[in-house]
């Protein structure tokens, strides 16, 4: 009789910390074409997830209360799932993983800043590409959906500085945990489940994600919204700051305090 060997389908927290640090090193060490191509895909995938959110949430009558937001939030995670399972680079998950590798002294500050800068630009191009060609040109973010697109975009640009910062913190605490749990799982189903619920939660709550905003604000602008480029830029800066604090401190920082060894 052959001996039954049980293999865990997940990593223990200490193992997960070391694995995430290695992932951060790999992300920071990638070539320029690696970062640009996967960064474009990362921005585009998040935008497609947001497009699905707008179509679903915008089609539910107001009489059903929060059902539209809940159902929209349920389909949004497809974007991050495509990134974490299929391949892509997302600035918010890199704020967690690459910063963790920096805290673990595996990457330099220069490598960290370079990675965040390049991935942010590539995400922006991917998100705006989807907003224009798959949203505006096709009409999917306009017509019957435009009321939802406009209301969502205006709510983003009209937040105060501190509202935006802490909304960004809450968002990337959850997005960082979505990436963390995806890294934890060893099979595809585990990665999908680990990603789904934290991402669904941040969308249902209404926290702000810098790459998601790279899609929805331009989508509204392409449709004729009275939103200026300066408002868009200001929102990007504020939400980027909040997202960085959430991913770098509440995920990477606290797990480094808990699990970093002296080796």
Residue ranges and their predicted role:
Residues 2-263:
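Alpha-helical transmembrane segments and their helix-helix packing motifs
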């Amino acid at each position: 009789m052959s001996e039954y060997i049980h293999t865990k389908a997940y990593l223990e927290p200490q193992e997960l910390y070391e694995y995430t640090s290695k992932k951060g090193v790999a992300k920071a060490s990638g070539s320029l074409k690696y970062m640009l191509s996967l960064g474009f895909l990362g921005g585009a995938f998040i935008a497609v997830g947001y497009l699905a959110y707008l179509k679903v949430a915008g089609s539910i009558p107001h009489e059903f209360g929060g059902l539209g937001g809940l159902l929209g939030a349920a389909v949004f995670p497809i974007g991050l799932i495509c990134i974490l399972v299929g391949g892509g680079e997302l600035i918010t998950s890199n704020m967690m993983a690459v910063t963790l590798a920096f805290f673990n002294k595996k990457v330099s500050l220069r490598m960290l800043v370079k990675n965040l800068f390049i991935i942010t630009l590539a995400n922006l191009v991917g998100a705006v590409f989807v907003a224009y060609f798959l949203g505006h040109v096709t009409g999917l973010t306009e017509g019957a959906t435009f009321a939802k697109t406009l209301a969502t975009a205006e709510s983003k640009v009209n937040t105060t500085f501190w509202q935006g910062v802490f909304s960004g913190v809450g968002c990337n605490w959850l997005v960082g945990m979505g990436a963390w749990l995806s890294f934890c799982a060893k099979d595809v189903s585990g990665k999908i489940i680990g990603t789904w619920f934290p991402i669904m939660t941040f969308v249902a709550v209404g926290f702000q994600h810098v790459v998601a905003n790279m899609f929805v604000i331009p989508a509204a602008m392409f449709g004729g919204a009275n939103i200026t480029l300066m408002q868009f830029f200001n929102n990007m800066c504020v939400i980027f700051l909040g997202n960085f604090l959430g991913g770098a401190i509440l995920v990477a920082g606290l797990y480094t305090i808990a699990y970093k060894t002296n080796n």
